[in-house]
Design a protein with these regions (language model features):
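Conserved NTP-binding/hydrolysis module of P-loop NTPases
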Residues: 74-97, 104
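Pre-Walker A adenine-sensing motif
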Residues: 7-27
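Glycine- and small hydrophobic-rich membrane-insertion segments that are intrinsically disordered
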Residues: 92-121
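A short hydrophobic beta-strand->loop->alpha-helix junction that borders the nucleotide-binding pocket
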Residues: 66-75
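Conserved Walker B catalytic segment
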Residues: 125-169
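Walker A/P-loop nucleotide-binding motif
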Residues: 26-45
Length: 170
């Protein structure tokens, strides 16, 4: 990272994030905490834009930043779906959803039921070269043990880099 900081008062955080994002398999996550409204999300967004500028060429090996808001999330499947949509933006398009519904209906008419299959049965959500940012931890509707346990699977079992943003006081 350059010597020029957007946040001179937070240089120690930027320096640590420089160190963390350079690790191959850190085996721990980073928690960025502070009161609501102090700019945690803004800070991490600007930091990531600075160290990983927008990719011009898809063949470049710039890590993909996967930023997920946990606000209102009730299940790990919801998190999986958001991650898959970040990796595969075409999944967000109405045409893709409509095609999926039509395909599912056709299979059901043939006696094949896909209701028990989940999106992550078809897509890998763990990419160690990417950086996962889980924002709004305190606003997640899952029990804290369940949400942190699930996030831990990215770090401990899949060697992913994870930054969690939240307000410990809430």
């Amino acid at each position: 990272m350059s010597d020029q900081s957007n946040f001179p008062n937070n240089m120690h955080i930027e320096n640590f994030l420089d160190y963390y994002t350079a690790l191959t398999a850190p085996h721990y996550a980073v928690l960025l905490t502070g009161k609501w409204g102090i700019g945690k999300t803004f800070f991490i967004t600007k930091y990531m834009e600075k160290i990983f500028p927008k990719q011009e060429d898809e063949s470049e090996k710039i890590p993909k930043i996967i930023k997920i808001s946990l606000n209102g999330v009730q299940t790990k499947d919801e998190i999986d779906d958001m991650i898959i949509k970040e990796f595969h933006p075409f999944m967000n398009k109405k045409s893709a959803r409509l095609t999926g519904k039509i395909f599912s209906s056709l299979l059901k008419s043939q006696g094949i039921d896909l209701d028990n299959l989940k999106t992550d049965d078809f897509f890998n959500i763990y990419h160690p070269e990417s950086i996962y940012i889980f924002d709004d931890l305190e606003r997640c509707c899952m029990p804290i043990e369940a949400s942190l346990g699930y996030i831990n699977s990215f770090v401990e079992n899949n060697n992913c880099k994870v930054i969690i943003i939240g307000n410990e006081e809430e």
